[in-house]
C-alpha cells in the first residue's frame, strides 16, 4: 500500500500579519488603515529589508508616536531563535526557531569562500513521507506563512551583517528552499516569499533570482505553474531513483506522478526559463547505487539542460539505510559522465549537527 501523503496542511490559527506578507501596495493600504501617511510604508520597508532592522525603537526617522503602533501592527515577532548549533569552525550554523504558536522549524546558514547560502524551511514538517528523510517521517504540522519564510532570511542576514557569524560581516548570496517541507505544496506563500527576497530594496531584499533554488519531490502541476511564472530561480528535483519501481518506495509521491512525468515537467521548466535543472539523487548503499541505475539515470538526463547532484545519504535516527561505499560512489559518477552528464557529489555541510539534507527535524529544543 502506498505511503500516506499530505498535500493540504492542517488548519491552524494563522500567524499575525507582518510587513513581509504584503506587497508594496498592500503595505501602503495597511499603513493608511492605521491612520499613518502611506509613505511610512516605504520607510518601514527600508528599515526591515534594507537595514535588516525589526525593532521600531531604532527607527528614529519615524515619529515616536507612530513607532509602537506600526511595530505592533506590521512587525510582530514571528520567529524566536531557540538555539544555534555550529560546525565547520563556525562556518555552518543551524538555527532552531520557535514560531508564535510554539511550532519549531530550522534553517541552516553555510559560509563558503565565494558565497553564503541559507537553507530555509517552507513548512513545519513535511507531508511527503519519504522514508529516508527525518523531516518527512515527522509528518506535516502546518505551512509557514510568507513572512515566516522571509524572516528566516532577514534574521540570518542581520546576524551575518553584524558579524555575529564566524568569518566576519557578510551578505547572503544564495537561498535554497531545501529545509523542512515540500516548497511547492505551499506554493502561494513560497512564491510570495521569493518575490520578497528578490524584489529590489526597499520592496524586498534584492537577492538575485538566479541565486534562489526551489526543490520539489515532483509535484507536476506546481512545477508547471512555476514554469509559467518565468522566473529565473533554479528548480531542483529530488529524484533519488531513475525507475518507478524503486522511486515508488523512496519517494511515495511517485505513485501520483511517475518519473517520466516529473522529468518531462522539469525539462519544460529548463526549456522555458533557460535555467539548468538540478537532479538531486541521494546515494543509498545497495538500494539505488547500482551501476545499471547510474546508466539509466544517465540516459534519462543526457542531452538535457540539467546537472546531477549526488548526495551521500545523511544518517537519520532509526534509519535502516546508509551512504554508498566510496568506490561505488566513484563508479556511479564515472558512469554518469560516460553519458555526457554533468555531475558533482555534494559537499555535505552540517552532518554533525543534524543540519544536512534530510536531517532537519526541529528536535532538541
Swiss-Prot record:
Keywords from the UniProt entry: 4Fe-4S, Cytoplasm, Disulfide bond, Iron, Iron-sulfur, Metal-binding, Methyltransferase, rRNA processing, S-adenosyl-L-methionine, Transferase, tRNA processing
CC cofactor: [4Fe-4S] cluster
Enzyme superclass (EC): transferase
InterPro entries, per the entry: Aldolase_TIM (IPR013785), Methyltransferase_A (IPR040072), RlmN_N (IPR048641), RNA_MTrfase_RlmN (IPR027492), rRNA_lsu_MTrfase_RlmN/Cfr (IPR004383), rSAM (IPR007197)
SUPFAM superfamilies: Radical SAM enzymes
GO cellular component terms listed in the entry, alphabetical order: cytoplasm
GO molecular function: 4 iron, 4 sulfur cluster binding; metal ion binding; rRNA (adenine(2503)-C2-)-methyltransferase activity; rRNA binding; tRNA (adenine(37)-C2)-methyltransferase activity; tRNA binding
Residues annotated as domain Radical SAM core: 112-352
Gene Ontology biological process terms in this record: rRNA base methylation; tRNA methylation
Subcellular location as annotated: Cytoplasm
Co-factor binding comment: Binds 1 [4Fe-4S] cluster. The cluster is coordinated with 3 cysteines and an exchangeable S-adenosyl-L-methionine.
Additional note from the record: Reaction proceeds by a ping-pong mechanism involving intermediate methylation of a conserved cysteine residue.
Family: Belongs to the radical SAM superfamily. RlmN family.
NCBIfam families per the UniProt record, alphabetical: rRNA_mod_RlmN
PANTHER family, per database record: 23S RRNA METHYLTRANSFERASE, RADICAL SAM CORE DOMAIN-CONTAINING PROTEIN
Protein name according to UniProt: Probable dual-specificity RNA methyltransferase RlmN
Organism: Thermobifida fusca (strain YX)
Amino acid at each position: 500500500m502506498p505511503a500516506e501523503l499530505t498535500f493540504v496542511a492542517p488548519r491552524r490559527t494563522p500567524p499575525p500579519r507582518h510587513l513581509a506578507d504584503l506587497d508594496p501596495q498592500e503595505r501602503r493600504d495597511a499603513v493608511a488603515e492605521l491612520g499613518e501617511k502611506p509613505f511610512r510604508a516605504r520607510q518601514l520597508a527600508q528599515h526591515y529589508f534594507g537595514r535588516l532592522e525589526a525593532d521600531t525603537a531604532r527607527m528614529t526617522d519615524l515619529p515616536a508616536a507612530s513607532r509602537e503602533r506600526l511595530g505592533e501592527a506590521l512587525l510582530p515577532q514571528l520567529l524566536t531563535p531557540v538555539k544555534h548549533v555550529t560546525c565547520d569552525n563556525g562556518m555552518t550554523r543551524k538555527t532552531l526557531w520557535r514560531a508564535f504558536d510554539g511550532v519549531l522549524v530550522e534553517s541552516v546558514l553555510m559560509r563558503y569562500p565565494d558565497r553564503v547560502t541559507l537553507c530555509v524551511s517552507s513548512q513545519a514538517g513535511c507531508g511527503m513521507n519519504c522514508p529516508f528523510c527525518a523531516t518527512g517521517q515527522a509528518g506535516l504540522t502546518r505551512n509557514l506563512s510568507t513572512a515566516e519564510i522571509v524572516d528566516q532570511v532577514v534574521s540570518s542576514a542581520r546576524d551575518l551583517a553584524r558579524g555575529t557569524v564566524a568569518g566576519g560581516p557578510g551578505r547572503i548570496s544564495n537561498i535554497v528552499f531545501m529545509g523542512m517541507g515540500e516548497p511547492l505544496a505551499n506554493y502561494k506563500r513560497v512564491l510570495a516569499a521569493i518575490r520578497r527576497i528578490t524584489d529590489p530594496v526597499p520592496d524586498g531584499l534584492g537577492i538575485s533570482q538566479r541565486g534562489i533554488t526551489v526543490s520539489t519531490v515532483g509535484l507536476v502541476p506546481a512545477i508547471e505553474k512555476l514554469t509559467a511564472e518565468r522566473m529565473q530561480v533554479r528548480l531542483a528535483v529530488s529524484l533519488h531513483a531513475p525507475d518507478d519501481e524503486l522511486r515508488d518506495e523512496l519517494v511515495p509521491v511517485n505513485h501520483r506522478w511517475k518519473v517520466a512525468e516529473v522529468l518531462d515537467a522539469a525539462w519544460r521548466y529548463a526549456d522555458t526559463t533557460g535555467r539548468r535543472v538540478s537532479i538531486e539523487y541521494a546515494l543509498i548503499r545497495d538500494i539505488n547505487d547500482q551501476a545499471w541505475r547510474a546508466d539509466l539515470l544517465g540516459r534519462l538526463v543526457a542531452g538535457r539542460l540539467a546537472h546531477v547532484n549526488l548526495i551521500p545519504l545523511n544518517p537519520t535516527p532509526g534509519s535502516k539505510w546508509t551512504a554508498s561505499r566510496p568506490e561505488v560512489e566513484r563508479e556511479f559518477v564515472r558512469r554518469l559522465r560516460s553519458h555526457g552528464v554533468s555531475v558533482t557529489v555534494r559537499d555535505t555541510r552540517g552532518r554533525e549537527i543534524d543540519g544536512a539534507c534530510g536531517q532537519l527535524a526541529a528536535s532538541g529544543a
